[in-house]
């Protein structure tokens, strides 16, 4: 039997927002499995699906570069925000973003590409910057989107400089119409993606494993009602329809005009663009997403020093 430690309970509390005893029981019921325990708490109505740890804390910058039909978004991490605000670091992130345009957009290909400012590879240039600045840094993630005919619209939320910030979005729009009008609606949709973080463009593109996990949680929640299985099945189907509406971009209420869905807003924009519009891809990078920064307990450190 898996031992349930205080650290495990603490982690589950941070991830779920549930109380200590509920977390302890959830872990015991699920053999210490963290994700299964979160689902168990959700099924009991104790935790919310979108509750996050709140400890996402890597520093650095998101950088975006675009050539119209191709755009790339990169994440370069540093240890402190002080370095992220440094002009040299910002220039490097901007340079890496521009280099990434001529690669296939993967981290490996970008690291291997030549960084114009140094004549060395991006990877070696980052190592040189580490030696100069005295702080560890790394190219962590990158995504590139392309269209043959259309635009890849970009948006950086709360930009600290042109193309640099903490959150970057790309939206690829395929259309033979007016590119200026296309970019206008594309940027608005990129702002929408920044705000809502959709899981996919269309409902059928939502990851099957994610959808199945939601379905299982909804089944358990519905069974708590004590209703017959045929009623539960209808309840689950209704909740799944609502889930897909909430997480698929095209069915979401458009943040700029909530009276329209994103799909309806696109249809309206086609009047100005002069041709049909199809969203072929989206990318959204939030700085530090998925990284936990180690928190130091100052009181514990002092106590440890005092004990020798």
Swiss-Prot record:
Task: Establish whether keyword Protein biosynthesis is in the entry.
Answer: yes
Give the Pfam families listed for this entry.
Answer: EF_TS (PF00889)
| The organism's place on the tree of life at top rank | Bacteria
The places in or outside the cell where this protein is found are: Cytoplasm
UniProt GO molecular function: translation elongation factor activity
Q: Where is this region: Involved in Mg(2+) ion dislocation from EF-Tu?
A: 80-83
Q: Which PROSITE patterns match?
A: EF_TS_1 (PS01126), EF_TS_2 (PS01127)
Keyword Protein biosynthesis appears in the UniProt entry: yes
CDD domains per record: UBA_EF-Ts
Task of the protein: Associates with the EF-Tu.GDP complex and induces the exchange of GDP to GTP. It remains bound to the aminoacyl-tRNA.EF-Tu.GTP complex up to the GTP hydrolysis stage on the ribosome.
Family per record: Belongs to the EF-Ts family.
Task: Tell me what this protein is called.
Answer: Elongation factor Ts
Gene that this polypeptide is encoded by? tsf
